[in-house]
């Protein structure tokens, strides 16, 4: 059973890759996640994966809003986990953060012989600090505590990069053998370059593309300021910009874009299909990642970087540690948070087609030969093998129902039979 709260499945690419890979290797997989406009079904089976979704009736704003969302989603997840236990059964819960609160479910199900895996997507304390500029308060330290409890509860931990591995070893005091670096490599079967579509440039010679979530910490406001400088101060009026993705900050960013007088050449698409995404990325001349420096961003692997590289696109980004590891020579790096220098780096690439081609080819080969999911997924299977070897369970590839599940199922069937007899 995989639990994810941030995004619905299959929109959450990491979780979907994990689920399908496990299924392809013989595991029975269920997922609990939120609904969305794109994925409104409460239950469906996709590619053999049982997906259970719940509705979140409000959009989180501010700390209290996020807290309410986390509590509501946690309760819905707990409810659905019981349904999965009864209907499908499971031996392992894999909880993806944020939030770092599902260790409580892990502890509960450990009472019935289930194991708990922590899939560490985000450094929650550092993300909170990036959102609310608070590193000293009670809430920051509470998040540190929740992270430690989650790491302690987990039998094994999946992390996205070496920086997160260090956190698991140092802050969580995990054994090295229990921490697996599972990089979210792109799926080359899903992401494939297509013929460029000049119409997407909206009558201008160049297209610059941003892909990703639009939350307060994602730096899209930095990008808009860089675009303003590039267009009005460097007189680059020959460039269209497209911003692809959704998130809680979208409407505020659209208003900012309108107020800056850039609505004619900066366009927000919202979330798009894989086919439309391939058209945009195949057409773009330059792709950008404006994540500003924070401890969270500096230590996090940004999936957009790898997806740009699949399409052989040169990248402009702020000089952050894990972005540098992923892109290497496929990107030009601006001093962190310097929007003018960021704009200048875009200008350099627009003026140098040979540089763009060389950087793009390097990045594409790095993904194809090293960073694609086909190369990065083995630690996922190794982590599950470690869990099942410890359990010495014969159900490693087809989870059996626990005694509790069977008892509950018998009670359920008894109630149904009683009601049927009453009719």
Enumerate the language-model features and the residues they cover.
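Conserved donor-binding/catalytic core segment of Leloir-type glycosyltransferases
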Residues: 1, 200-228, 242
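N-terminal subdomain of nucleotide-sugar transferases
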Residues: 1-52, 156, 402-423
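Membrane-proximal helix-turn-helix segments that form the acceptor-binding/catalytic region
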Residues: 78-82, 101-112, 124, 138-157
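Acidic donor-binding loop of glycosyltransferase active sites
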Residues: 155, 265, 281-299, 313
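Carbohydrate-associated surface elements
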Residues: 163, 184-185
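Acidic anion/phosphate-binding donor-loop and adjacent secondary structure
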Residues: 169-173, 185-200, 219, 389-390
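Nucleotide-activated donor-binding/catalytic signature segment of Leloir-type glycosyltransferases, i.e.
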Residues: 244, 251-278
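Conserved acidic donor-binding segment of nucleotide-sugar-dependent glycosyltransferases
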Residues: 331-339, 348-354
